Amino acid sequence: MEQEPLQPRQGDLNWRLSAHPVTLLCFLGIRLSALLMYLFGILFIKHFILVFIITLLLLAADFYYLKNIAGRRLVGLRWWNEVNTTTGDSHWVFESSDPNTRTITATDKRFFWLSLYVTPAFWIGLAILAVIQLSVIWLSLVVIALVLTITNTVAFSRCDRFSQASTFANRALSGGIVSNIAGGLLGRLFK
């Protein structure tokens, strides 16, 4: 009796199942390259300043790509911060794609959210290591990385909650609850 090889299923961590494999690979590549440059850059590039600058540029690229491209293409979410010029107040704006017009694959969602939450955990570990080693200059770079990654993590988490709440409200108003209540009331009137 011969067993069939397991076929990859939607939701597996296999980039070939992604609806947007180029976006996914660029997202993971940029995200991983900042960590790798921080960890191993000094082995290949002997100048600390150059490693610092390259890591900082990779962190900025990661922040931008995640916020503006990967978030929108992989999970249909986007966020930004607006400042009212008259009062100076700032507020977060969340945008999600219409669930009826856009299909988001389980694989893309899984890669996105796993990477979104695991990366700050790595940077927290590196911050603890920098504190233990009393390396203030490396700690400054890790703090910048933490600010950028945690900002994206918090913003996308809020955006996802906002998206789920608005989707629930739209479904309730568009057909589910409202039509049941209206049907029940009309049914009682014409009995």
UniProtKB/Swiss-Prot annotation:
The chain crosses the membrane at residues 17-37, 39-59, 111-133, 137-156. It holds the Pfam family DUF846. GO terms for biological process: protein secretion; vesicle-mediated transport. It is found in: Golgi apparatus membrane. InterPro entries: TVP23-like. The keyword Glycoprotein applies. One of its GO terms (cellular component) is Golgi membrane. The keyword Transmembrane applies. Belongs to the TVP23 family. Golgi membrane protein involved in vesicular trafficking. This is Golgi apparatus membrane protein tvp23.
